[in-house]
Amino acid sequence: MSFRSLLALSGLVCSGLASVISKRATLDSWLSNEATVARTAILNNIGADGAWVSGADSGIVVASPSTDNPDYFYTWTRDSGIVLKTLVDLFRNGDTDLLSTIEHYISSQAIIQGVSNPSGDLSSGGLGEPKFNVDETAYAGSWGRPQRDGPALRATAMIGFGQWLLDNGYTSAATEIVWPLVRNDLSYVAQYWNQTGYDLWEEVNGSSFFTIAVQHRALVEGSAFATAVGSSCSWCDSQAPQILCYLQSFWTGSYILANFDSSRSGKDTNTLLGSIHTFDPEAGCDDSTFQPCSPRALANHKEVVDSFRSIYTLNDGLSDSEAVAVGRYPEDSYYNGNPWFLCTLAAAEQLYDALYQWDKQGSLEITDVSLDFFKALYSGAATGTYSSSSSTYSSIVSAVKTFADGFVSIVETHAASNGSLSEQFDKSDGDELSARDLTWSYAALLTANNRRNSVVPPSWGETSASSVPGTCAATSASGTYSSVTVTSWPSIVATGGTTTTATTTGSGGVTSTSKTTTTASKTSTTTSSTSCTTPTAVAVTFDLTATTTYGENIYLVGSISQLGDWETSDGIALSADKYTSSNPPWYVTVTLPAGESFEYKFIRVESDDSVEWESDPNREYTVPQACGESTATVTDTWR
């Protein structure tokens, strides 16, 4: 007799169970639709074919279609890098229609890198210029410049695609197109990381946690990418440890200081964003890199989130265990200071990351540093290490997931009825404010949703780059800058039978000009490889035939976190919208890690919250892990 049957025999009744599951099922349904809205909206904001950004050049990511109050009709290097990293991850998980968008973006950045601007030119600081006109010309107006996070984020996005090219046989494109562009950005990071600049909110001129964190990541994965293309990055290797060393100075003992050289408290979603953009699915809960599940990052999460509890009317009356609307920082006065969609989603995403990391390592640790975070969600929390097989672990994980979902539910509540997401929503009435259809808001929705479904990006190498040097040194290093012109991409087969070719002009491949050498012409070889993407996640549809009575609902539970770790309150609701008396199907589609093996069962939840389990034995399934296979269907009958 299985553990599930023992629970059934005990007549398990969970107080409020139906309500908890109903809320989660409603959020599941909204997110499924909103993810489609977000993907479409992002493409609408990318030139030249984006429906909302007429006049933008090919591959240019426009921050928002808004042209007045405020005017965001520009392309920011930071926002573009974050958005493209999101699209690259979707592409690597099987969304192959994004190929041409990614290629066009990289081609556009070859132009942008070479545009002389108020911050300098290619080799004299120009890569730190924060924004450009959508026709790929310099913005000459007054602005907070330089901003040094952009090159790091752009490098990370391009490395992700470059690695896919290498994995799928397109070595020439990775070596001759992507690597020279990445090398420019890595050279900038190594040369300028120890100099001040404006933060991601474009307001504080100093040293910023977010900037330093993403710079460390970029140099670490940049060095590995250099090796993979048969080159090297000595400036990456010498500076990454020193950047990590400096990163430690942002820890105050109770939270992460967002910026040096600022009179504000330093509690800022800058730090939550830094944690999620340096999340590594292979990492442990390392304090040194402020991984999402680390004691430091969790303590900081509580401090930052709590700083917004009393300043927004929307958050009135909510307890410490409930999610709240989150803005940039409590002292914010822009548009009178309001919650932001991307900030509220960042609060959720960090927790989804942490849940993934705990599940992967099979335990969670509570330390003196993180105790207050856990006690707010689970009153019985105490310092110690809790195995995933323990009831305490299950209770804490369930509480954290509910807390994380609460932030996303706030976004659902204040999103427009058609799913559109602006930059902000009003702190009193929740109405959308500021720039409409903010591209970064949509990217934040997609990444939070993926992490919620345990769909994670590839490792960036944190496990070999988390050791802090004994002594910090205020250093820098010079790299190699070269102008790059992308004139064509190879014909790339991104799925088993579909060839997608980017439309370009000219001939040849890449023209690269080094600072210290004469112009050299290289030819990018057109490839007709039949390689395809093996997704890291698969959309699995569970089809169940089950005759039910009015008021009964069917849920799916199982042995993995995506199916609730056997917790009935975390079960996945099945839909009965196709149900007839002669044909009673229930179904749900769940995104699961490719290759994952697990056990599962279906349960009935009655209107009085009582639970009925299927008969033994537990069902078993292994998610497909094959070239081009991104969907699967499991057909069952209630027993």
Swiss-Prot record:
Cysteine disulfide partners in this protein: C233-C236, C245-C472, C285-C293
Signal peptide: 1-18
Region spans: Disordered: 497-529, 614-639
Reactions it catalyzes: Hydrolysis of terminal (1->4)-linked alpha-D-glucose residues successively from non-reducing ends of the chains with release of beta-D-glucose
UniProt binding sites for substrate: W143
Residue ranges of coiled coil: none
Superkingdom of the source species: Eukaryota
Active site: D199, E202
Molecular function GO labels: glucan 1,4-alpha-glucosidase activity; starch binding
Entry keyword annotation includes Electron transport: no
GO terms under cellular component: fungal-type vacuole
EC number in record: 3.2.1.3
Biased composition (Polar residues): 628-639
Family the UniProt entry places it in: Belongs to the glycosyl hydrolase 15 family.
Protein name in UniProt: Glucoamylase
Native species: Aspergillus usamii
Lineage: Eukaryota, Fungi, Dikarya, Ascomycota, Pezizomycotina
Gene name, Swiss-Prot/TrEMBL: glaA
